[in-house]
């Protein structure tokens, strides 16, 4: 899915990806090779952690959660990095193992990172609380029967996004709502690469309406987008305004520095 080969990206994604185009095919191949190398490196480090647990005699009663916060577009749709709600960016690796976790099971229940925090509390024991959280423990989900129709939600408001983007996925369908832009609806079972937008297809109108209702039950997209942008504007102003923030980023300090009192203890 490359714009250079005629692929036409969604207008929201096209605006988001400005500045990432222009790589030659050789540069793209080298970038992919580097990414795969990083994946191998991370896998090796996870192996070291698991090996250390076994060597310490802790492998049998330690629960392990291996995951990430996002995927990687890796050139798909002409994009690199994260920030979009297509499968290549929002689908993440997630492997759990340990005490009371079914071995060699592939779970077909959709989950999201809101399920990770309850899982950590679950592993810590019932005294940790968390009963009122929106997610469900991954360990409980893994031990239960599969629920492919479970609904999951994601949103994005951050770097380079022209407006808020919201996604709900249920069963074989994914619905993406963009504030100020047209929506997208995909049949993931028959179109896993998300190339055919069904949002305007009359035959799928009821599915779109159902998923829009599910999204609306979670939040008001326009109000949430306005709130996020107001918070972002206030944060920029607290740090001296756009010019000051950009100058700091250009100087290599596009992060929050460690407080001096913490550095003194290191």
PLM regions and their residue ranges:
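Active-site-proximal cap/lid insertion segments
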Residues: 1-61, 65-110, 123-126, 130, ...
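Intrinsic disorder/low-complexity signal
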Residues: 3-7, 42, 60, 154, ...
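Long, internal low-complexity/basic segments
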Residues: 7, 11-27, 200-266
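C-terminal cap/loop subdomain of S1 sulfatases and analogous C-terminal strand-loop tails that border
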Residues: 70-76, 114-117, 122-188, 193, ...
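Residue-level signal for well-ordered alpha-helical positions
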Residues: 77, 198-201
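Short small-residue beta-strand/loop micro-motif enriched in glycine and branched aliphatics
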Residues: 102-105, 193-197
């Amino acid at each position: 899915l490359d714009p250079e080969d005629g692929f036409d990206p969604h207008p929201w994604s096209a605006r988001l990806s400005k500045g990432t185009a222009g790589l030659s095919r050789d540069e793209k191949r080298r970038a992919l090779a580097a990414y795969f190398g990083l994946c191998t490196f991370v896998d090796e480090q996870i192996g070291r952690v698991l090996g250390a647990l076994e060597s310490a005699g802790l492998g049998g009663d330690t629960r392990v959660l291996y995951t990430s916060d996002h995927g990687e577009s890796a050139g798909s749709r002409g994009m690199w990095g994260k920030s979009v709600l297509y499968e290549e960016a929002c689908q993440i690796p997630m492997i759990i193992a340990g005490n009371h976790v079914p071995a060699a099971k592939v779970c077909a229940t959709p989950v999201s990172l809101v399920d990770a925090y309850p899982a950590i509390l679950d592993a810590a024991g019932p005294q940790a609380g968390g009963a009122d959280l929106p997610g469900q423990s991954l360990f409980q989900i893994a031990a239960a029967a599969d629920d492919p129709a479970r609904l999951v939600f994601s949103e994005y408001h951050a770097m380079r996004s022209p407006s808020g983007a919201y996604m709900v996925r249920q069963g074989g369908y994914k619905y993406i709502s963009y504030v100020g832009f047209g929506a997208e609806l995909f049949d993931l079972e028959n179109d896993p690469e998300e190339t055919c937008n069904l949002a305007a297809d009359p035959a799928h109108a009821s599915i779109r309406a159902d998923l829009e209702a599910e999204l609306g039950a979670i939040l008001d997209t326009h109000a949430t987008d306005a709130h996020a942008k107001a918070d972002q504007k206030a944060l920029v102003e607290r740090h001296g305004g756009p010019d000051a923030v950009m100058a700091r980023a250009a100087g290599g300090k596009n992060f929050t520095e460690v407080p001096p009192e913490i550095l003194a203890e290191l």
